[in-house]
Regions:
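Basic, amphipathic alpha-helical recognition segments used for DNA target recognition
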Residues: 106
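Alpha-helix capping/helix-boundary segments
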Residues: 102-103
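Conserved nucleotide-cofactor-binding alpha/beta core module
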Residues: 126-128
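Glycine-rich, positively charged N-terminal anion/phosphate-binding segment
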Residues: 40-57
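Surface-exposed amphipathic alpha-helical tracts and adjacent flexible/coil segments at the periphery
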Residues: 2-25, 29-36, 55, 61-85, ...
Length: 415
């Protein structure tokens, strides 16, 4: 009987406390980066001093610490990057996560001994691209989230000597593996410089349009007109022209049909609430049920997204995915309780993404831009225990009579 190799469990860390929690709850490695050069410029406590402390603690515990440098730099950051990464490399991180070919070339030339992991930002979707990067000297590929399980398996078969990393949990981007321009367009904040404002999560109002019979120009159709979105353009114009009584008619409904010009006839219903509509809001990735398959494929590392998430998020995801990996290696069947434990985290609804090629509307949450989970609320962190008393740093309100789950590396209990 062949013994399966356990994939590395890789967790995010936005602070030293979150790094320690990730290790305590089962992570083999964490990733963190300098705010200026990673894609998390906000809510990121890892300055140079913290990176040094983190790397030292990781190695003392037999764990790994990867430094994220996956921005796509403009000219002014190329020179400063090489200057600022030098003291980081002197601290002996276990690898750099990078996306830009130019920076990869420069790091390889100056520090050829440093392992380079190719970021998901590089959009690696086939085995030929993996071989290309292998020839360049990259030691691990973080595969694009757009791949199915079968495609991942094919890459493993064609590239048996390359380390492969796959995202299994966390936020998904509407754009192709994070290459999004929305934030730059609306706020002049470049997502690929680490300053994404998550414009895809905002609510967007919609209005129908019709041609002004006098000018021939497009004009908005007020919601109090008798406008049927299923009618042809000609019928819509006639309806708009004929209706001027200012009354909202029964057949008018706040249900819109969105049609992409390149796919005529494929209508997508858009629901609007009092805040707007959410046509770009992706659900969150949850692939815990596929850990067994990914382990059998031979994926080297399973990654959780979320450097800006809470300590509770880091602890829970580390604990759940650790159990899933251990079960897969031991040959135990998948435990559905792991899904319910992840359901308690704040989330936008879950999807397995493109791993199992579900219908397209399974990936998006059109109803709301806010969390649809959050059945559990993070109420506090135990900071110290002495003489039977616990010092708790409160994060949210809780009251006498509330059921509180205490999660601990040795086991959870409800009090």
């Amino acid at each position: 009987m062949t013994t399966l190799k356990a994939p590395e469990l890789l967790l995010p860390a936005g602070s030293l406390d979150k790094m320690r929690a990730a290790y305590d709850f089962g992570a083999d490695a964490i990733y963190a980066g300098q705010p200026r050069y990673s894609l998390r410029a906000r809510n990121n406590e890892f300055k140079l001093e913290q990176i040094g402390i983190g790397i030292a603690e990781a190695h003392q515990r037999g764990k790994k610490f990867f430094v994220t440098s996956n921005l796509l730099p403009h000219n002014d950051k190329v020179r400063t990057y090489m200057r600022d990464i030098e003291p980081v490399i002197a601290m002996k991180p276990d690898g750099l996560i990078m996306a830009d070919p130019g920076l990869i070339m420069m790091v390889r030339e100056k520090w050829p001994e440093v392992p380079i992991h190719l970021s998901v930002q590089a959009n690696t979707v086939n085995w030929a691209a993996v071989k290309f990067w292998q020839q360049v000297g990259v030691t691990r590929i973080i595969l694009s989230r757009e791949l199915s399980l079968d495609e991942i398996e094919k890459i493993r078969q064609e590239c048996p000597d390359m380390e492969l990393e796959v995202f299994v949990h966390g936020a998904l981007c509407i754009a192709y593996s994070g290459r999004c321009l929305l934030s730059g367009y609306f706020n002049r904040r470049d997502p690929n410089q680490g300053t994404c404002t998550n414009a895809c999560r905002w609510s967007y109002g919609t209005q129908a349009s019709a041609t002004d019979p006098n000018t021939g120009e497009a004009m908005a159709v007020p919601m109090d007109t008798d406008f049927d979105f299923a009618k042809s353009q000609q019928e819509a114009e006639q309806t708009f022209s004929a209706c001027g009584d200012g009354q909202r008619h029964p057949e008018a409904d706040k249900i819109y049909l969105l049609e992409e010009k390149g796919r005529p006839g494929q209508l997508m219903p858009i629901m609007e609430d009092e805040h707007g509509t959410y046509i770009m809001n992706s659900k969150d990735l949850r692939a815990v049920e596929y850990v067994d398959r990914l382990t059998k494929i031979g994926v080297d590392s399973l990654k959780v997204e979320g450097r800006t998430k809470s300590l509770y998020y880091v602890s829970r995801t580390a604990q759940v995915y650790r159990r899933a990996i251990d079960d897969a290696v031991a040959g135990r069947p998948f435990n559905p309780e792991l899904i319910s434990e992840l359901d308690g985290l704040a989330n936008r609804g879950y999807t397995a993404g493109l791993m199992d090629r579900r219908p397209a509307n399974d990936y998006q949450n059109y109803e709301t831009g806010h969390s649809v989970g959050h059945r559990s609320q993070f109420v506090g962190e135990v900071r110290a225990v002495a003489d039977g008393w616990a010092e708790i740093e409160t994060k949210n309100k809780f009251s006498v009579g509330d059921r509180i789950e205490i999660i601990h590396p040795s086991g959870n209990r409800i009090v």
